[in-house]
């Protein structure tokens, strides 16, 4: 059986939440936000989980989240970096023998186990795939001065989520070439793989409920979704 490792990122500062508590540790229906994504991966076909956390949070996550909720697939809890991609790199450096890697934002608590399993099935066939949903809005491209430059075809515009999945060797190669991407605004793992310009990345249909907790309003939305969909709990 092929080994699939999930890297769950929980090192974000969450400055837009206007709270002293990191967003991934805020309570959502009496449980930490991070609990929900870890539960989804624990129940999935993933073999093991690496959790990447902020400075001085390793002990807290182990004692207050992983042990109490019995997340047995978590093999490592490591400290993150100053940027998202550096946190992923720290997680990658703990992997010894995986065939595939899924990277997920811990601030996306409403990821479904079925979606994770679909991504695993797709990446085993296609080597690189990311979860996304079709844009509901018209998207405009603007200049730095705020002037509208163009309007892409909405049928080709997707809002990208996580998890993002890759054959381990591909993601490792991409991160080994990080030095050549200096100056690039790297916002997800697909961008780093895109820079290799050798591997097609396929879309996997996601769920509009797979929101990222970024602002206080997002917690309200997530709670409303949980009330309607008990399978997340």
UniProtKB/Swiss-Prot annotation:
It is an enzyme of class 2 (transferase). One of its GO terms (biological process) is isopentenyl diphosphate biosynthetic process, methylerythritol 4-phosphate pathway. InterPro entries: IspD, IspD/TarI, IspD/TarI_cytidylyltransf_bact, ISPD_synthase_CS, Nucleotide-diphossugar_trans. One of its GO terms (molecular function) is 2-C-methyl-D-erythritol 4-phosphate cytidylyltransferase activity. Keywords: Isoprene biosynthesis, Nucleotidyltransferase, Transferase. Pathway: Isoprenoid biosynthesis; isopentenyl diphosphate biosynthesis via DXP pathway; isopentenyl diphosphate from 1-deoxy-D-xylulose 5-phosphate: step 2/6. Its EC number is 2.7.7.60. It catalyses: 2-C-methyl-D-erythritol 4-phosphate + CTP + H(+) = 4-CDP-2-C-methyl-D-erythritol + diphosphate. It holds the Pfam family IspD. Signal peptide: none annotated. CDD domains: CDP-ME_synthetase. The record marks 16, 23 as: Transition state stabilizer. The record marks 154, 212 as: Positions MEP for the nucleophilic attack. Catalyzes the formation of 4-diphosphocytidyl-2-C-methyl-D-erythritol from CTP and 2-C-methyl-D-erythritol 4-phosphate (MEP). HAMAP family: IspD. Belongs to the IspD/TarI cytidylyltransferase family. IspD subfamily. This is 2-C-methyl-D-erythritol 4-phosphate cytidylyltransferase. It comes from Lachnoclostridium phytofermentans (strain ATCC 700394 / DSM 18823 / ISDg) (Clostridium phytofermentans).
């Amino acid at each position: 059986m092929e080994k699939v490792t999930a890297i769950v990122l929980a090192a974000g500062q969450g400055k837009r939440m206007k709270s002293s508590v990191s967003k991934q540790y805020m309570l959502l229906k009496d449980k930490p936000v991070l609990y929900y994504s870890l539960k989804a991966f624990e129940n999935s076909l993933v073999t093991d989980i690496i959790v990447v956390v902020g400075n001085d949070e390793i002990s807290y996550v182990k004692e207050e989240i992983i042990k109490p909720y019995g997340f047995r697939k978590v093999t490592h809890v490591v400290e993150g970096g100053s940027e998202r991609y550096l946190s992923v790199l720290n997680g990658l450096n703990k992997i010894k023998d995986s065939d595939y890697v899924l990277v997920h934002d811990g601030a996306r608590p409403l990821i479904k186990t079925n979606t994770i399993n679909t991504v695993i099935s797709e990446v085993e066939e296609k080597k690189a795939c990311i979860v996304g949903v079709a844009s509901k809005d018209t998207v405009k491209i603007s200049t730095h001065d705020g002037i509208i430059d163009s309007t892409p075809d909405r049928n080709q515009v997707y809002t990208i989520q996580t998890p993002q999945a890759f054959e381990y060797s591909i993601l490792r190669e991409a991160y080994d070439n990080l030095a050549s991407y200096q100056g690039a605004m790297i916002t997800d793992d697909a961008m780093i793989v895109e820079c290799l310009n050798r591997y097609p990345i396929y879309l996997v249909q996601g769920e509009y409920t797979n929101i990222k907790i970024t602002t206080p309003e997002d917690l309200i939305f997530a709670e409303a979704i949980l009330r309607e969909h008990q399978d997340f709990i």
